[in-house]
């Protein structure tokens, strides 16, 4: 498994629907980049004023993140995104 460092988080992307509400099938080129994912690994935390502070997200959280944030990586056939905690906008549910 990928173990992120510091304030980084590894997420597995949640793919968007392949068809519209009216039943039109969207080609890959028409789909927007996903902005939702599931946290699969969390770094050790960030350092502020010499103190280590734990991240606000944890493994299993569903999150929304900035549209162009992070670095895409493929590991053991699965696509992941590694991003910093400050690129996370919200935790869902």
From Swiss-Prot:
Entries under InterPro entries matching the protein: Chaperonin_GroES (IPR020818), Chaperonin_GroES_sf (IPR037124), Chaprnonin_Cpn10_CS (IPR018369), GroES-like_sf (IPR011032)
Q: Which UniProt keywords apply?
A: Chaperone, Cytoplasm
Compartmental location: Cytoplasm
Which GO biological process categories is it annotated with?
A: chaperone cofactor-dependent protein refolding
Task: Look up the record and report any one GO term of the cellular component aspect.
Answer: cytoplasm
According to its UniProt entry, the function of this protein is described as: Together with the chaperonin GroEL, plays an essential role in assisting protein folding. The GroEL-GroES system forms a nano-cage that allows encapsulation of the non-native substrate proteins and provides a physical environment optimized to promote and accelerate protein folding. GroES binds to the apical surface of the GroEL ring, thereby capping the opening of the GroEL channel.
What is the name of the protein in this document? Answer: Co-chaperonin GroES
Organism, scientific name: Oceanobacillus iheyensis (strain DSM 14371 / CIP 107618 / JCM 11309 / KCTC 3954 / HTE831)
């Amino acid at each position: 498994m990928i173990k992120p460092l510091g304030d980084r988080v590894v997420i597995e992307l949640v793919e968007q629907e392949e068809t519209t509400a009216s039943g039109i099938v969207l080609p890959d080129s028409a789909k927007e980049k996903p902005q939702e994912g599931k946290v699969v690994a969390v770094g050790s935390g960030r350092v502020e004023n010499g103190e280590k502070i734990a991240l606000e997200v944890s493994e299993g959280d569903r999150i929304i993140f900035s549209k162009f944030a992070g670095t895409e990586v493929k590991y053991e056939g699965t696509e992941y995104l590694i991003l910093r905690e400050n690129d996370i906008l919200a935790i869902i549910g």
